[in-house]
Amino acid sequence: MATPSGKAAPPNPQVSKRSLPRDASSEVPSKRKNSNPLPTLPRPSGTFVEGSIVRIAMENFLTYDICEVSPGPHLNMIIGANGTGKSSIVCAICLGLAGKPAFMGRADKVGFFVKRGCSKGLVEIELFRTSGNLIITREIDVIKNQSFWFINKKPVTQKIVEEQVAALNIQVGNLCQFLPQDKVGEFAKLSKIELLEATEKSVGPPEMHRYHCELKNFREKEKQLETSCKEKTEYLEKMVQRNERYKQDVERFYERKRHLDLIEMLEAKRPWVEYENVRQEYEGVKLIRDRVKEEVRKLKEGQIPMTRRIEEIDRQRHTLEVRIKEKSTDIKEASQKCKQRQDLIERKDRQIKELQQALTVKQNEELDRQKRISNTRKMIEDLQSELKTAENCENLQPQIDTVTNDLRRVQEEKALCEGEIIDKQREKEMLEKQRRSVSDHITRFDNLMNQKEDKLRQRYRDTYDAVLWLRNNRDRFKQRVCEPIMLTINMKDNKNAKYVENHISSNDLRAFVFESQEDMEIFLREVRDNKKLRVNAVIAPKISYADKAPSRSLNDLKQYGFFSYLRELFDAPDPVMSYLCCQYHIHEVPVGTERTRERIERVIQETRLKQIYTAEEKYVLKTSVYSNKVISSNTSLKVAQFLTVTVDLEQRRHLEEQLKEMNRQLEAVDSGLAALRDTNRHLELKDNELRLKKKELLERKTRKRQLEQKISSKLASIRLMEQDTCNLEEEERKASTKIKEINVQKAKLVTELTGLVKICTSFQIQKVDLILQNTTVISEKNKLEADYMASSSQLRVTEQQFIELDDNRQRLLQKCKELMKKARQVCNLSADQAVPQEFQTQVPTIPNGHSSSPPMAFQDLPNTLDEIDALLTEERSRASCFTGLNPSVVEEYSKREVEIQQLTEELQGKKVELDEYRENISQVKERWLNPLKELVEKINEKFSNFFSSMQCAGEVDLHTENEEDYDKYGIRIRVKFRSSTQLHELTPHHQSGGERSVSTMLYLMALQELNRCPFRVVDEINQGMDPINERRVFEMVVNTACKENTSQYFFITPKLLQNLPYSEKMTVLFVYNGPHMLEPNRWNLKAFQRRRRRITFTQPQ
């Protein structure tokens, strides 16, 4: 390792609460308040180039409280362990020289670079200038996220700082000059075009990049002018061709105009001809109207005598109708009296018929009574015979008692069996209800599980397919296999799912958990190798960690707002829980609330926990190996996606066992119920048999008593029928007497009816005579009314004809006026203007007395509408042959001639402008391309030499596909690290990380020797290099950066190889940090060097 010399100046990061002095030569305050001030660090000797960094000072910046760095003019090796603050110096250079935070690739706000817990930070950089050093100060306000700028202690704007920095050719945004640690990988990603621009800005003359930009702008303008000239030339040719075609169109236009003029004359005469035709029609209609009017008058006079005779006949008819009504009334009264007599006669006939029917009924009843008595006597004889022949009734009561007892016993057994059946049915209904409830509960669990599986299928389809395979092949595994952790975890509260998902990686959340290595190999062989599914699998620890106790009791942490450890927030199978405890220490990670976040500083200092969760953040705590301080980082919690659905698998298994037990109970109940029903059917059959047997015995016992009762009843019935007798002779005599009396009354009524009929007949004859007289009068009236109606009909027709003729006359008169108005408008004559004599042919008279005069030009034209229409059709057909013409053809032709002239002049001007641009491009191209080729050639020479010294090959060339596309020019780097390969372009994908680092470093060294920028910064570019290449590159860096008149170089690295070369022009800056650092006021560089020499001299050879 390189040893420091007298020129080495360690930056000595220091911790202090006091402000940094504003004077560059003032002392740096120490860590302790009572210590003596530390004198300003000695500056390395040597010659600084214009713009080199002389001093860097930081206060409350990233890892530093207060720090001051004094680099050398050539190569500055900044060495220190990771996390000590090397890259903080790089950030200070960038931000102090008006660079943007994005240039470092670390943060987007400048406030993030201020040390944690501080509200303000400060960066001060002193740049070398021959006219006097330039001190740039940047104060950063964290709260406002603003910066305040000072140049030589005077406040200025950021723009002024940027101008001063640019004047010294400092470009912290150019990766060829300033390459931070987080941007090393991006250098290889630079396109050829971007690399060319960065190189131009870094080592090219100041005007080179400006010429390049001008060339690109000129070329773009040239393309626009070429396109414009081409478009205008094509448009001009089309305009000339179109005007050539329009010459013939103009001639055809005038031919068409002659036809249109004749059409206009014919259309002007046509209204006059129409008017004359309508006027003649009007005169004819008026003559017919007057004749019809005279006919109407004669018809009205002929209707008066008929009207008077009809009125006289109406009076006669009214008198006859009154007399007819009177006779009708007399006839009606006589008819009513006749009807009354007829009704009385009919009533007497009905009385006679009723008497005869009553006698017949009594005769029939007597015959029926005799017949019933005979039948009843016969039935009594049959019953007595049956009673005699029937056997004597034996004693059946003991048999009846036995059957009754057996029947009672069977009924009791049946009632008991039916009760048991009802109890079994109730038990079955209760079990079925419970089974439905448990089944519904299981269905709800399955629905929730399906939701989790749907999320798994949508996000990780391969894992989902593997789950399906596992469920179908569980018998192939010897020990327990758990499905992906996200399916087996069951949150006790969905709100806490975010903690678990943020703590467990997504790869493990979808991992299968095995208890056996052999089972896992079988699973992966089938799923990964055979089915080509991308799945994860883990093995649970052999010794279970699931119930391992935390190192600290939760009660001790509740004072900080912690309410649980992660393990207690969810349930999971024992292998899953054991794996998570072992891998993620979920039994040691507490979960807090908003109260925890409010006391986070106290929690970090007092608890010494490694990971904690607050309401919305995750904190990871580490202890620095240097300072023994606690370093914390926090991230916001992401929203939970998979564990928000809660499924208690243990409860589901318990419910499935309940369901199986209920099914077994239901089977037992159904079996018992079937046996009870069989027993009940057997008892019902026995009950029916006993009932039939008892019925037969009872019927045999009661048969004799029934026969005796029937005989006694029949004898009583005969006695009643014999008592109910009737005397038919007496009844016949009474009926005959009543009939004779009724016939006498009937004869008297017939005599009265005959007289009334004669009177009614006389009234009818008189009425008929009156009706005949009325009919004659009505006939005469009808004839007169028919004649009157015919006359009236003719009158109406004639009047209607008159109205129509009069309307037609009015219509024709109005039409004549309209046609006259139209004809005068066509000839441009007003209503009261007289037509001059020379334009008149005839003077027809308008029906209202006004005169009209068509122009004499109409004499040569046809005088009928048919002839005019025929000629119009012919002329229009001729005019229509000239298609595609319009009145603006000539005007457009003339305008186009003018436009062609203007366009020719404009095109000539564009061509002159295009020639000027091409001349400018040629001149600027010569000023830009030749120096650029020389520059690239120099870079290529240096780059090739560097690679040759490493037994590799590399070249740099100017690449473009088209010489005229100046925006496509780029620098192409091609390298070859092995003799067996060809040169390949440097890309982020073809070469390894170490090869890219070597190529980048050598390219920057090639630029270094061209010495255009005041300093270059390369941060940890040797990461990933193999030791051989790293040693070679280091030697080249030392040889290149330590030459005379080269720019300043900052090489930052956390480690170096042993026995590296050292140059007197190198400055080695060691960065140390930690709790055991020597205080700044006690640091004595000379004493340290003396002790180092003494140790070296006293060491044994």
Swiss-Prot record:
It is found in: Nucleus; Chromosome; Nucleus, PML body; Chromosome, Telomere. The keyword NAD does not apply. Sumoylated. The keyword Transcription does not apply. Disulfide bonds: none annotated. Expressed in testis but not ovary. The modification Phosphoserine is found at S25, S35. One of its GO terms (biological process) is cell division. Gene3D superfamilies: P-loop containing nucleotide triphosphate hydrolases. Residues 207-440, 645-753, 780-828, 888-927 form a coiled coil. Keywords: ATP-binding, Cell cycle, Cell division, Chromosome, Coiled coil, DNA damage, DNA recombination, DNA repair, Mitosis, Nucleotide-binding, Nucleus, Phosphoprotein, Telomere, Ubl conjugation. One of its GO terms (cellular component) is nucleus. Core component of the SMC5-SMC6 complex, a complex involved in repair of DNA double-strand breaks by homologous recombination. The complex may promote sister chromatid homologous recombination by recruiting the SMC1-SMC3 cohesin complex to double-strand breaks. The complex is required for telomere maintenance via recombination and mediates sumoylation of shelterin complex (telosome) components. Required for sister chromatid cohesion during prometaphase and mitotic progression; the function seems to be independent of SMC6. PANTHER family: STRUCTURAL MAINTENANCE OF CHROMOSOMES PROTEIN 5. Belongs to the SMC family. SMC5 subfamily. This is Structural maintenance of chromosomes protein 5. It comes from Mus musculus. The lineage of its organism: Eukaryota, Metazoa, Chordata, Craniata, Vertebrata. The gene is Smc5.
